[in-house]
Amino acid sequence: MTVEAYKRFVGETSGKMPRTPSFNQGWKNGQMPIVNVTWDEAQAYCAWTGGRLPTEAEWEYAVRAGSAEARYGPVNEIGWYDGNSGGRTHEVGQKRANGFGLYDMLGNVWEWVNDWYDARYYENSPSADPPGPSEGKGRVVRGGAWVVDPWLLRTAVRCRYAPVDWGAVIGFRCARVVVP
């Protein structure tokens, strides 16, 4: 989600912008990913647009785009990480898209997903459309960020944060049900 899109949300809902990271003073660049949002703030934005945060399974399906590979291309071509980011986020869509035409699925910012984190969940979950744990202490983020080593920019990597956490490495994208 971009700063520009989030500003529209804030303007129409009387909300407030998140804390400004030092590399985007005043949220001047609308094409940067929105960061410093909590899980609840991300969820509220998605609901406002008629969507929701994707489940972890949906996110992984989207990033893989029909592939079983760990990445959808060479790491320098697909994502921003600690070795090429210059210590900050970058405008969305600057790196190569995946097979579904989605940009920034790996790198730039971690993305909140709907699921609670359970380190062992996938060992016991159904293989088709797992619903995710019903409770937990942290919410899942996926995709890696501009501060991580390149080996973390892989389709299966997952991490967790408390839902109230926010930071210059955490953003989100929304999902919608598409009726054919």
Describe the residue ranges of each PLM region.
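Active-site rim elements
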Residues: G30-P33, V92, A97, R158-V164
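Active-site microenvironments of metalloenzymes and redox enzymes
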Residues: M1-P74, N114-Y122, R176-P180
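A short, contiguous structural element within a folded domain that forms the immediate neighborhood
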Residues: E77-L102
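Cysteine-rich, disulfide-stabilized extracellular repeat modules
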Residues: G30, T49, P74-E77, R88-E91, ...
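Surface-exposed recognition segments
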Residues: W27, S67-A68, S85-R88, M105-P180
